[in-house]
Amino acid sequence: MSDKECTVFVLDLGKDMGTCHHGRSHSDLEWTLSYFHDELSHKFLANRKTDVVGIVGYKCDDTKNDLAEQEAYWNISVLYPIQTALFSKLQSVSQTLKPSNTMQGDLISAIVVSFDLMARHCKKNKWKKKMIVLTAARGIIDFSDYIGIAEQLLQHDVFLGVYGVDFDQEDINYSEPLKESQKKENEVRIQEFVESCHGQYCTFQQIYNNIGKPWVRKVRPVAIFRGTFSIGNRDSKDTSISIQVERYPRTRLTKPPTSSAFYENDMSKNYECLNIENSNVENKSMESDAVSTVRSYMVRDPKTNDSFEVKREDLESGYSYGRTIVPISRSDEDVLALDTIPGYEILGFIPKSSLPIYYTISDTNIIVPKDDFESKLNFSAFVQSLEREHRYALARFVSKDKGVPVLLVLMPYVEFKRHYLVDIQLPFAEDVRPYSFSEFEKLSNEEDMRQIDFAVSNYIDNMDLDSSDCGFNPPFEPENTFSMIPHRLQQAISYYANSPEGDLPQPNIYLTRYTNPPKSLLDNCILDLKLIKEKLTVNVPVKPKYSSQETAFDTGAPISEEQIEELLNSGLDEQEGEKLLVLHVSEKDPVGTFTEVLKNPFGLEDALTEMEKVIKNLIDKSKYDLALQSLQSLRLHSILEDEVERFNEYLTRLKKDVMQNNKPKENELINKIRSSGLDIILHDELTRHDNFNNI
């Protein structure tokens, strides 16, 4: 379960916040609200039910708080009571965040009002409490009781962050020129107050530089496995060691936000213009536009050609066995489950250098020992041994009872004097695609080889990202790189939520920082790259083109595994479709209807028999071209369906019948059959076809 977080923003809405200072084009309030809106967008995108927000403004024209009976709390308004961040409500509140007509209102009193809101909402429950103050610190501030207030904040674990417009900050060498004496004194006292409650005090300029930085969601560590780590024969206690360990995710792919289908009508377009105070009504209205998906299962009767609906519970799993569907019930699938025991079991060890780099195909997980002395001692000794011997461990891992075993490589990892193992899943034999690629031609000229080696060596040295000439700031490190797609989409969602008709701004500098190599380094490599390009000119060979898959078979040219698989399984995807089943081979379109009949379950025998009759009829009707096309299709599918003997017998009978008629054109047809490669299927052609399947 994620931590419950309560955040209260304290905003300075004084009259002075409406002016621009030091050449800025935005007023002080607009400037500080840019951070406020950026923080809210993070909360909307996170969409956590345990994350609540409150907004308190001071130096307001009116007073709206529970402590307003005392004069010290006048001109302070609770603009948004602590609750879940609702976009429509916060959008209406944001429209009221404008400079007031007064300078009355105390900052310390506003902090007290915010603390009172937190205390009543969070009570004594475990919350992560944050109070963010955005102010220019102009005017008079009452610091008479700040020590007692700081003690209360510390006692209730409230984090206080004060980010001030044009605050002086020594550690970044920033100071505002011609600062007013009152503002300067306020900054000093505010810094003392913040430091006394262990908060954060900094100038808003530093905060503003981080606005738009991709937000990385923090995830609480949750163990995905707890069990035994066995070294040796686990069945024998005398010859094995069992360590209690826990497994945690280390790296996981962050996916972009997913979209949902909604129906946009006139009411949903005008909805955001309404000011609805009841959140239940709001949620119900938004959910009414969501599109729900209903799935139905239809079965077609091949005899009557009618369809009828069946329930999901009445369906069974089926697997294709050639063109036959083999059903396996759920009870049978349970019987097929492996009788395995959860845990890690060490199989052996390999040198680090023997692991192919492309074998790491999975996410990474980290293994830590349980919090007892014996487990930590044994585990630490095992990790240190791997590190000293420069080896990895191979382990068999099962995550649950009767689970599927996987093969892992365990890598030693030491961080902050703590010992861990990082596990990465290895592929099985069927998971590897052992493609072989043609070699590049070697240069016969030794002088050319020497020049290329020298140029490549210079290029590598000049493109060193750790050098002082590198233009990346900050340096190129994994923690400074961000995935473009999810963060760019989040930026678009946040922008269009506030400005539906606006133009999406350019991607943030944090996303585009490492999209191109540093120009300063590339300029040093121009001559080397030019030499490499001249010496290593690669001519791409022209790929042969085939008009059809039959041509590829007839010419002996290889076709891809995907093309063969498509031919073999071309009918499976349409068995449950809306297309009507074709039950007979027609003389108008013999090739097309023959292919469709083959898609039917148990349609092979009918398709071959009818195609043989159609070819004979076409010859009798002197439609020789169509007969040759049909014979070519029959020959190809006879190879694919292992009906070679039947085709050869049929072709022998067909030739004999044609020659008995003794017609000149039919005799010419026999010659065309031979010249077109449609004669009897020989053994070497079958061997060539088998080689295609093994590609």
Curated annotation (Swiss-Prot):
The keyword DNA repair applies. It comes from the Eukaryota. Disruption phenotype: Spores sensitive to ionizing radiation. It is an enzyme of class 3 (hydrolase). It is found in: Nucleus; Chromosome, Telomere. The keyword Nucleus applies. Pfam families: Ku, Ku_PK_bind. It catalyses: ATP + H2O = ADP + phosphate + H(+). One of its GO terms (cellular component) is Ku70:Ku80 complex. Keywords: ATP-binding, Chromosome, DNA damage, DNA recombination, DNA repair, DNA-binding, Helicase, Hydrolase, Nucleotide-binding, Nucleus, Telomere. One of its GO terms (biological process) is telomere maintenance. Its EC number is 3.6.4.12. Residues 229-461 form the Ku domain. GO terms for molecular function: 3'-5' DNA helicase activity; ATP binding; ATP hydrolysis activity; damaged DNA binding; telomeric DNA binding. Single-stranded DNA-dependent ATP-dependent helicase. Involved in non-homologous end joining (NHEJ) DNA double strand break repair. DNA-binding is sequence-independent but has a high affinity to nicks in double-stranded DNA and to the ends of duplex DNA. Binds to naturally occurring chromosomal ends, and therefore provides chromosomal end protection. Required also for telomere recombination to repair telomeric ends in the absence of telomerase. ku70, of the ku70/ku80 heterodimer, binds to the stem loop of tlc1, the RNA component of telomerase. Involved in telomere maintenance. Heterodimer of pku70 and pku80. Belongs to the ku80 family. This is ATP-dependent DNA helicase II subunit 2. It comes from Schizosaccharomyces pombe (strain 972 / ATCC 24843) (Fission yeast).
